[in-house]
Amino acid sequence: SLAFVEKVGYPVIVKPDNGVGATTTYKLKSEDELRAFHEEDFHGVQFIMEEFVPGEIYSYDAIMNSKGEPIFETGNHTPISIMDSVNNHDDSVFYIEKHIADDVRAAGRAAVKSFGVKSRFVHFEFFRLTEDHDYLGKKGKIIGLEVNYRPSGGFTPDMINYACSTDVYKDWADMVAFDRLTKEEYPDKYYCVSAGC
């Protein structure tokens, strides 16, 4: 791990290879913190180490048909670090974006194409850089973070339903059964935000 830190510098992120959310994820800012991490007993859990990326998280959430085309698209924005919220026991905040930014949509669709995704609900996460980075790019650039072949977790599908005036459970079933939406008209609900511990 010291060789990796010498290459990318501090801070670094360490997280379980098979983790959920930001549980047991750490931002190490010094050699002392790195040594303390290595002295902990994590009961055989394997960790991966990543370079810290300064950014806010945006997601691309979509239902893809059998041709790999989106039949429904939305996303969310997490302006406060989930890792900091978990580790500091702070509140977390995110909101559904009814109309996702063009660059997030383009990145999501490019990932779908690259991975050959068909007939799936996807939840892809991206960083939007909050500052210039030597080799990742300029502030505002979209950088890939995570690929999931499933809906976003927790109550997010219900938030999507509210924010987008839809029923993603029915939309997902429509994709499986008919490869298209058999959309009903739902009353407009407009927006949905989550704030909590």
Name the predicted role of every residue range.
Residues S1-P54, N65-E69, V93-A106:
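Active-site nucleotide/adenylate-binding loops and adjacent lid/helix of ATP-dependent enzymes
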Residues E6, K113, Y162:
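Short polybasic/polar patches that bind polyanions
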Residues D41-Q46, E51-F94, D102-I142, N148-P157, ...:
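Phosphate-binding core of ATP-grasp and ATP-grasp-like enzymes
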Residues R109, K170-A173:
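Non-transmembrane alpha-helical segments in soluble domains
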Residues R150-D171:
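ATP-dependent carboxylate-activation loops
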Residues A173-C197:
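Peripheral (often C-terminal) accessory segments that flank ATP-dependent C-N-forming ligase machineries
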